[in-house]
């Protein structure tokens, strides 16, 4: 059997997922390919139809389609249900199943940065929902969309608060692309930081990771997060466990 996986979203050209999954397939002794599919919402729906028809073994989903993916699933794991967001899809029988390997990765990342009492969530999309599903303390949101922030408050009642009320020492959780083009997070955020979970990745460290490391703060960077998320997706699709270290090494080597 040859597996066929793909990452769907826009943008996807920068993704390191193909390198990670090729490494996982090789270590597991499995045949397969991992593709990148840039798509708009209508094209994504067509891709899900192809998944259901058996043309793909599994899909990863990235921005901006994680919420749409959630609505297209027949069944979902507890993690996806908690997050109201799906980043991993497969077919069992004739039904589409959704999972959030983001939630799994956030649970580990939160422990790795010292199990903080509060976090400052940067962004309001699907990854942000996964962070909220994984963390059970107060969450202070810094986002551009008041509508999306209000949606988070409705989904997670009593858990979401305005950034202005956030205490110093909160862990920053960056679920936006800020940093991918070499830009630093705003000073108002850094002033509150007691640690950092930084999802963006690019060539080397993002400025936020360099800043946090230089200030002696606990950090989980985008490569580490992506590797745990990818290993979880691979196991959910294939039933084979491949260590995140294999994925992380492949990601850092491009």
Can you say where each PLM-predicted feature lies in the sequence?
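Conserved beta-strand positions in the Rossmann-like core of class I SAM-dependent methyltransferases
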Residues: 35, 140, 220
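Short helix-loop-beta connector
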Residues: 92, 113-119, 191-192
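NAD(P)-binding Rossmann-fold cofactor-contacting core
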Residues: 137-156
């Amino acid at each position: 059997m040859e597996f066929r996986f793909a990452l769907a979203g826009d943008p996807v050209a920068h993704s390191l997922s193909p390198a990670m999954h090729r490494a996982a397939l090789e270590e597991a002794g499995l045949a397969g390919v991992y593709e990148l599919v840039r798509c708009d919402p209508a094209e994504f729906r067509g891709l899900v139809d192809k998944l259901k028809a058996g043309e793909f073994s599994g899909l990863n989903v990235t921005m901006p389609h994680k919420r749409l993916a959630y609505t297209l699933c027949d069944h979902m794991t507890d993690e996806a249900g908690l997050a109201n967001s799906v980043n991993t899809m497969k077919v069992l029988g004739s039904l589409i199943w959704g999972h959030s390997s983001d939630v799994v990765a956030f649970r580990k990342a939160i422990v790795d940065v010292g199990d903080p009492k509060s976090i400052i969530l940067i962004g309001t999309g699907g990854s942000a929902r996964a962070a909220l599903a994984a963390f059970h303390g107060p969450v202070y949101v810094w986002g551009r969309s008041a509508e999306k922030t209000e949606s988070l408050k409705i989904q997670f009642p009593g858990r979401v608060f305005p950034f202005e009320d956030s205490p110093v020492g909160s862990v920053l959780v960056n679920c936006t692309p800020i940093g991918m083009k070499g830009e630093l997070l705003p000073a108002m955020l850094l002033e509150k930081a007691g640690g950092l979970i930084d999802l963006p990745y690019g060539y080397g460290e993002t400025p936020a990771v360099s800043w946090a490391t230089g200030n002696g703060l606990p950090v989980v960077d985008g490569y580490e997060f992506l590797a745990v998320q990818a290993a979880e997706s691979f196991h959910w699709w294939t039933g084979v466990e491949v260590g995140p270290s294999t994925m992380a090494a492949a990601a850092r080597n491009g």
